[in-house]
Amino acid sequence: MQQKLQNTKNLVSDVFNKVYNKYDLMNNLMSFGVHKSWKKQLIYSMNPRNNKKLIDVACGTGDIAKLFINATNSRSKVSCVDPSKKMISFGKNKLKNYKNISWKVAKAEKLPFKDSQFDYYVISFGLRNTKNLSKSLSEAYRVLKKGGRFFCLEFSKIDNDYLDFLYQNYSKLIPMVGELIVGDKKPYEYLVKSIKEFIDQRELIDLMKKYKFEKCEYINLNGGIVALHSGWKV
């Protein structure tokens, strides 16, 4: 299942190579800091055990990796993967004291790992940016161990008309904020458009099931502004 907007040549990589050094700041501004609680909810839902391996795909600057290591122990390991070289470099420097986090430049559709390597797979605000949802989910299933769990935290469809009205109007301001902070509004015009075009909660559940995940479920956060999906490789 290809995504038309994301298949525009070099669009997504150019977006994140432009904003990497202001990525954390913009996340805080755009969500009023709420993205931190969404990510903590993901880790809480995961309830990770010690000495396990996580792959964090479309890792950004490594927020999920840091939360995972802090919630487990020093023998847990995280492989952070992102298609943006600049984002990987920035995240690696940001978390340089975390010796059990490794970093690779790669895309969700083609992960540089052998089959059945990880206990947990996370993609946080990244599935929407992939060129091909089907390939991304197939790769997620491939690299998970049997009994491993998949998590996707992503912008979704709001289930309240009033909240949706407020959000749609607020989203019009995001490119202006991006221009003020980053000096370029185009990456944030892409952000807003990609959110509008992304599939809804039930469609993602159906796609997960198509690619062999079982016990698939989701919870809406903040009225569906964001949804947390999960499934198992059994």
Predicted regions, residues:
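N-terminal, positively charged/glycine-rich alpha-helical extensions of SAM-dependent methyltransferases
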Residues: 1-24, 170, 181
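C-terminal alpha-helical "lid/dimerization" subdomain adjacent to the S-adenosyl-L-methionine
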Residues: 10-11, 81, 153-207, 211, ...
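Hydrophobic beta-strand segment of the Class I
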Residues: 23, 121-122
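Conserved alpha-helix/loop element of class I SAM-dependent methyltransferases that forms part
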Residues: 32-52, 67
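Class I SAM-dependent methyltransferase SAM/SAH-binding core
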Residues: 53-110
